């Protein structure tokens, strides 16, 4: 349909009851672009209507370099989304009415760059998805105000923010070139046997606990000469910084000297960051996971026997389950689940770990004999994890000297300055013999959790004639995102507070629909968590996020999480 036909429809339904807005669903040609009205809200106080704009890239005029590869495309879409957000924010609520009338809303990205459903290029077309609150007076349609949005506000937003001729070409080029340089660093990590890289001049401290913006007047990162490496990038040329080698790296130093700040930067180095963030060239192995203790965590059928055996209650640690894990059992499960999710790097902060899981000093071994202690500490397994499973560790510590014995590289943070003290510490260790190791022989976990469909996870209905409660196979589970780190599926809350590398609510929204899809289509009592994650990734690569929408049109608000976060979500689901 043409835009003029849309204008006629608006005129026809003006002053009618709000449900008459449903007649607007469809696609309308605005010459340069197509406006798609995909879902219309039920009333002005409900969640806003779902719209999209599709624009041929030839019309938009984007240069070839901006679409030359996946990294460039992702950066282009991120840039356009930020540009469109800046424009629509100016017009939001300029159209008046009740409730959400006049709202124009699109995702507001943070400092990380993601592939998002909000803005993507598919088959030579840019698609940008957003939400609009259709105006009403009470529950009576005010289509004159909606006409302003469709025929005045949105055309200006498209013109100013999506057409290349009106964009800042230099800023866009900076966005694209940085993304390609970041991809080049990730490629070079493996070739140099590095698990992370922090460029000289990076700004690691953040503004505050509630702001991820770079701290003003912060000490810029400088690499120790002994750990400095140089990388050649396609656009930035030669840059230098600290290369963190594979193996076991220990970060030590006094309190408030920057140990955790460095680790926090590394844990988010799995993502690309925008220009000006300060961590643009902080790049970490993209399978890295942060491990920490999670008291009270649900665990099911995890083989934690690598760390815990011979429990007094006779529980089988080769297939360990609990509704209320201790700090040590939760962290042990996290290690095993991370291995199964394909992680090649563990990031651990002593402050957020279970002490009895991490270390057991020599004097404690003398007081409590090994046959009375079911826990084999991480210090006894870290070397074996690297040599037998290829998993490196970066560990922050400040209280125990036991960690020095297992480290390949030891970095001291001194007032945010980095010092390589490996040789100095190795000399001192001659005076402190390695504590006796009573650990059982290393063996990779054998059993893996098979997810089974729990009847409680299936929607129920009550038969109005008999009063009996039955499974309703025609209904689907309801999901609701609560916060950035939790969502509801059915009546269960999935708690992701300790999955600390989640940074965006769109990741959480995606985890919710992925879990819903898995419960309804993949969990069958035969597949392991890893198999289900692989299948979800395969479907996404083939069909995109729309494959998980149950036939509904894809909206903005989704970004595909990593394999590691999908696995973490499945492992925290209590009903499978």
Regions found by a protein language model. Name each.
Residues 339-382, 386-387, 399-405, 409-426:
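Conserved P-loop NTPase nucleotide-binding/switch module
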Residues 1-184, 188-193, 204:
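N-terminal accessory targeting/assembly segments
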Residues 387-390, 396-576:
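Conserved NTP phosphate-binding and transfer environment spanning the P-loop NTPase/kinase superfamily
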Residues 142, 297, 307-328, 360-375:
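Flexible beta-alpha connector loops of hexameric P-loop NTPases
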Residues 190-196, 200, 256, 263-294, ...:
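Carboxylate/His-rich catalytic cores and anion/metal-binding grooves
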Residues 205-240, 275, 283-288, 292-299, ...:
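N-terminal pre-Walker A segment at the start of P-loop NTPase domains
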Residues 239-271:
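Glycine-rich phosphate-binding P-loop
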Residues 319-353:
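Phosphate-binding/switch loop-helix module in NTP-utilizing enzymes
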């Amino acid at each position: 349909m043409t835009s003029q036909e849309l204008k006629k429809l608006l005129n026809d339904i003006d002053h009618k009851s709000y449900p008459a807005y449903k007649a607007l669903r469809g696609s309308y040609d605005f010459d340069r672009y197509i406006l798609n009205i995909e879902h219309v809200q039920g009333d002005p106080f409900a969640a806003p209507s779902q719209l999209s704009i599709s624009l041929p890239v030839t019309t938009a005029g984007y240069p070839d370099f901006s679409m030359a590869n996946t990294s460039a495309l992702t950066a282009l879409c991120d840039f356009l989304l930020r540009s469109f957000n800046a424009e629509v924010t100016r017009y939001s609520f300029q159209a008046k009415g009740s409730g959400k009338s006049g709202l124009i809303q699109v995702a507001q990205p943070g400092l990380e760059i993601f592939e998002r459903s909000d803005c993507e290029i598919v088959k030579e077309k840019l698609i940008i998805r957003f939400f609009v609150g259709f105006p009403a007076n009470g529950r009576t349609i005010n289509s004159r105000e909606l006409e302003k949005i469709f025929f005045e506000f949105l055309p200006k937003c498209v013109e100013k923010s999506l057409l290349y001729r009106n964009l800042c070409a230099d800023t866009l080029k900076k966005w694209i070139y940085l993304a390609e340089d970041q991809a080049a660093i990730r490629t070079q990590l493996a070739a140099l046997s590095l698990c992370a890289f922090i460029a000289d001049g990076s700004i690691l401290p953040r503004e505050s606990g509630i702001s991820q913006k770079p701290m003003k007047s912060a000490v810029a990162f400088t690499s120790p000469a002994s750990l400095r490496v140089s990388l050649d990038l396609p656009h930035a040329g030669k840059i230098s910084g600290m290369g963190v080698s594979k193996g076991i790296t220990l970060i030590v130093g006094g309190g408030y000297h920057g140990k955790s700040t460095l680790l926090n930067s590394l844990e988010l180095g799995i993502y690309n960051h925008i220009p000006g963030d300060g961590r643009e060239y902080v790049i970490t192995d993209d399978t890295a996971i942060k491990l920490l203790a999670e008291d009270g965590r649900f665990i099911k059928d995890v083989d934690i026997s690598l760390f815990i055996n011979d429990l007094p209650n006779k529980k089988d640690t080769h297939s360990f389950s609990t509704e209320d894990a201790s700090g040590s059992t939760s962290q042990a499960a996290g290690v095993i689940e991370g291995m199964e999710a394909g992680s090649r790097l563990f990031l651990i902060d002593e402050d957020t770990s279970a002490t009895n899981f991490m270390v057991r000093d020599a004097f404690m071994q003398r007081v409590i004999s090994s046959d009375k202690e079911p826990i084999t500490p991480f210090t006894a397994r870290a070397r074996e994890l690297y040599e037998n499973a290829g998993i490196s560790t970066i560990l922050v510590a400040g209280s125990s000297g036991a960690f020095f014995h297992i480290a390949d590289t030891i970095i001291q943070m001194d007032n945010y300055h980095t010092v390589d003290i490996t040789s100095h510490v190795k000399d001192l260790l001659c005076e402190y013999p390695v504590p006796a190791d009573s650990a059982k022989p290393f063996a990779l976990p054998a059993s893996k959790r098979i997810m089974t469909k729990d009847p409680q996870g299936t929607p129920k209905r009550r038969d109005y004639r008999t009063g009996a409660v039955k499974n309703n196979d025609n209904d689907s589970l309801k999901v609701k995102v609560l916060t950035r780190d939790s969502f509801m599926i059915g009546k269960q809350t999935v708690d992701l507070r300790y999955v600390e590398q989640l940074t965006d609510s769109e990741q959480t929204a995606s985890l919710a629909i992925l879990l819903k899809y898995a419960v309804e289509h993949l969990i069958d009592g035969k597949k392991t968590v890893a198999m289900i994650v692989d299948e979800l990734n395969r479907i996404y690569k083939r069909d995109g996020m729309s494959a998980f929408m149950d036939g509904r049109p894809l909206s903005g608000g989704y970004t595909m999480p990593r394999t590691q976060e999908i696995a973490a979500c499945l492992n925290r689901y209590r009903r499978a």
